[in-house]
From Swiss-Prot:
Monomer. It is found in: Cytoplasm. It is an enzyme of class 2 (transferase). Keywords: ATP-binding, Cytoplasm, Kinase, Nucleotide-binding, Transferase. It comes from the Eukaryota. This is Probable adenylate kinase isoenzyme ZK673.2. It comes from Caenorhabditis elegans. The keyword Transmembrane does not apply. Catalyzes the reversible transfer of the terminal phosphate group between ATP and AMP. Plays an important role in cellular energy homeostasis and in adenine nucleotide metabolism. The keyword ATP-binding applies.
């Protein structure tokens, strides 16, 4: 069992880095689970859960735990015992449930200046139906201007969407810092600058390689 959480605000690059890690460690049985992808899939399919989730996301708010937790934990467990997590748990209620059912080994906090985050978000191209986002500098689409999965056109965020993104950054600061403080007290959290995805990937991959070479992965990082 080895579970890694990539934690960072919108625009921090956690999704890009998480996918890089999964590609690197896929031969060792690692899978990728992103709470955002799970939610966007339900929104795209118009499920009851997706409709309810969309109403909160449109306001720049997180989906309440009463709606989210049961569904997302079941999907997370399906990803298997070796998984790179993107964006979950985000608050203490979610953390408690995860630690009871699927405890984490390593948490990576990505620190990026607010000005850089806003700049990245303003440059993102978005697939409206799914919410998938691309950055031309660090995570470009395979074909210019088109979504990797559907081939449909990508669009820049509108002014209204950028304002929602700014509110999401404020929500992140209020909630996720408590989760990170919990893991820091357990010495399971490492903090890194998220301004270079490649540098973060290489550093985290090295930590994972060291742990996976041992019979029992370390559970604390000094």
């Amino acid at each position: 069992m080895y579970r890694v959480l990539l934690s960072g605000a919108a625009g921090s690059g956690k999704g890009t880095i998480a996918r890089m890690l999964v590609r690197e460690f896929e031969p060792l049985g690692f899978n990728y689970f992103a709470a955002g992808d799970f939610i966007r899939d339900h929104i795209a399919r118009g499920t009851e859960f997706g409709v309810r989730a969309q109403s909160f996301l449109n306001k720049g708010e997180h989906v309440p735990d009463s709606i989210l937790n049961g569904a997302i934990l079941a999907e997370m467990l399906k990803a298997g015992p070796r998984v790179v997590l993107d964006g979950y748990p985000r608050n203490m209620s979610q953390l408690k449930m995860v630690e009871e059912q699927a405890p984490l080994n390593l948490i990576v906090e990505l620190k990026v200046p607010r000005k850089v985050l806003i700049d990245r978000l303003s440059k993102q191209l978005v697939h409206p139906a799914s919410g998938r986002a691309y950055n031309l500098e660090v995570n470009p689409p395979k074909e210019e201007g088109k979504d990797d999965i559907t081939g449909e056109p990508l669009f820049k965020r509108s002014t209204d969407q950028l304002e929602v993104a700014r509110r999401r950054l404020e929500v992140y600061d209020k909630t996720e810092n408590k989760v990170l403080d919990y893991y820091k007290k357990q010495n399971k959290c490492i903090t890194m600058s998220g301004e270079s995805s490649k540098a973060v990937f290489e550093s985290v991959a090295e930590v994972m390689r060291r742990d996976l070479l041992t019979t029992t992965p370390r559970t604390a990082y000094a």
